[in-house]
């Protein structure tokens, strides 16, 4: 998100990790090459000792990013894991392109910030936010949110198997950011059934005092949870605008996104 962007040449150098940079150069070389590549060839390209290149290649092979050519044992090519990553990226890009106009409409209708988020490694990544007319006075949500104290997160948490929910709460100790913050499985279990049954999650000053958020799931025709859609704003304004009205508009938006995704396939 723009307010979290750090833009400077010195910062780029500071956070550049040499080993990761070299690994990416190997992948880029293989992408542009018309044939497979061997250790000697890559070592010459990177101007590195063969032993260093072999260690990088071995790690990439472990993660499926590269694989040995079945006809030439000491030659490598891009691995099939990249197909999975590419398909996931394509799906998120398609989702985002379809969701953006819907988010804009919701933000205009409600007058608050509309957000869409996806699950990534036990946290929510905010793919995009649109601000409504009144939402300019509200701090923008961070680029990631926790599962236990955000409406977007609680949608995903409620749809997980019970064993995974218990594991989430037992593996980490959560601090209360406000008096309303959920920090245990027992606390969340009181909300889980409501979230599933009613099809929405309400977060009322659990992340930050004065801020409330409502989210609904975006599920495909098979019931798979793709993302979550939310509206966030000052608690006082959200209550005045009527939660039921916001929930209905969010559910309508979720249906619109799914319908548009279906027609694009």
Which residues make up each language-model segment?
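Extended hydrophobic
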Residues: 180-253
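N-terminal helix-turn-helix
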Residues: 2-93, 255, 260-263
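Short, structured helix-loop boundary elements
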Residues: 16-20, 39, 75, 79, ...
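Short, solvent-exposed recognition segments
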Residues: 3, 138-207
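Cysteine/selenocysteine-centered motifs that mediate thiol-based redox chemistry or coordinate metal-sulfur cofactors
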Residues: 164-167, 172-173, 254-265
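Amphipathic alpha-helical effector-binding/dimerization core
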Residues: 72, 77-171
């Amino acid at each position: 998100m723009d307010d979290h962007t750090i833009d400077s040449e010195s910062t780029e150098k500071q956070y550049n990790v040499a080993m990761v940079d070299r690994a990416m150069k190997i992948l880029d070389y293989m992408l542009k090459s018309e044939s497979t590549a061997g250790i000697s060839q890559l070592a010459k390209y990177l101007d590195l000792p063969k032993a260093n290149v072999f260690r990088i290649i071995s790690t990439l092979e472990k993660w499926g990013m590269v694989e040995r050519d079945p006809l030439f044992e000491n030659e490598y090519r891009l691995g099939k894991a990249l197909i999975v990553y590419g398909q996931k990226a394509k799906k998120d890009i398609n989702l985002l392109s379809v969701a953006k106009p819907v988010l804009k409409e919701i933000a205009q209708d409600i007058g608050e910030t509309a957000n869409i988020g996806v699950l990534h490694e036990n946290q929510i990544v905010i793919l995009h936010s649109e601000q409504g007319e009144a939402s300019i006075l509200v701090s923008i949500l961070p680029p990631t949110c926790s599962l236990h104290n955000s409406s977007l997160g609680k949608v995903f948490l409620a749809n997980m198997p019970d064993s995974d929910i218990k594991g989430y709460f037992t593996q980490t100790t959560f601090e209360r950011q406000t008096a309303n913050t959920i920090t245990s499985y027992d606390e969340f279990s009181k909300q889980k059934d409501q979230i599933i049954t009613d099809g929405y999650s309400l977060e009322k000053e659990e992340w930050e005092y004065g801020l409330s958020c409502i989210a609904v799931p975006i599920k495909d025709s098979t019931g798979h949870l793709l993302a979550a859609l939310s509206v966030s704003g000052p608690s006082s304004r959200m209550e005045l605008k009527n939660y039921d009205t916001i929930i209905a508009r969010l559910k309508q938006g979720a249906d619109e996104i799914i319908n548009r995704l279906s027609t694009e396939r």
